[in-house]
Amino acid sequence: MRDLIRRTFSRFFLILAWPFRMIVKPFTAIRTFINNEPDDTPLVDVFAATVEQPSLLIDHLEALRRHILRALVVLTLAVLVSMAFTRYILEWLSIPIGGLESLQAIEVTESVGAYMRVAFLSGFTIALPYIALEIFAFLNPGLRRRERVTLLMIIPIATGLFITGAAFTYYIMLDPALDFLLHFLGIETAIRPSNYIRFVTGLMFWIGIAFQFPLIIYALAALGIVNARSLIQGWRFAILGIAFAAAAVTPTIDPVNMGLVMLPMIVLYFLSIGMAGLATRGRSRRQAKVQHEAGTSDLKD
């Protein structure tokens, strides 16, 4: 009887501790993996081994399943936590139009839908760094030390750029956009919660994604696809492309709001040129180091 009670309590505490162990495990994996070098097996040999031994693919899928499960657990917890602050977030988002009392719900479930949308997006934003860490933990065994450190640095930088883009949308771009839309042709507009929240959160999301442009250029330059010189030479075409992108993202057709979107994107483009130069320089140094080591080994032979 005593053993049964002990086993029952042990299993109970294991179940209680399982979510916390699942959360801590990726951070432990990061510390362990960051000092291990990957196996330099050619990609063709890897595919051949997978075909010959399907169990290898099953092992990778099982590892991916564990990472996805942990990410979903953290996302669910983040959404539940954010639900306690969702009303305050809704009030903050509705400040540009005079508060929540300025919204008019037509459908019965409209307010609930807007509430759940903000709760999910807030929880996703909170959980996004952890989800990125789970992706990193899955890819980590095949990365070199320098690549691991670079990815770990990119995660907070990407998060900061996204938050900067969302803040730029809310504090600078949203007021003139709403002023144009709500007073267009002098027609009185009844603002619905679902439409307004979808409009604001969608605009903040896509502008936040647009602010990731320097990181994308840095990655392409590190892979040798682009370089700073080609970006400088093609700046006119880049500005033209930015104009089309701003026209697609901007919710209005007036040049003021389009210019508000274009200006930071142009600044980000020229910032990307500097980051591309850094990435190209680092890539050249690594290639020179590899060639030097190869030449030294040939002389020894």
What do these predicted regions represent?
Residues 1-301:
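Membrane topogenic/interface segments and analogous intrinsically disordered interaction regions
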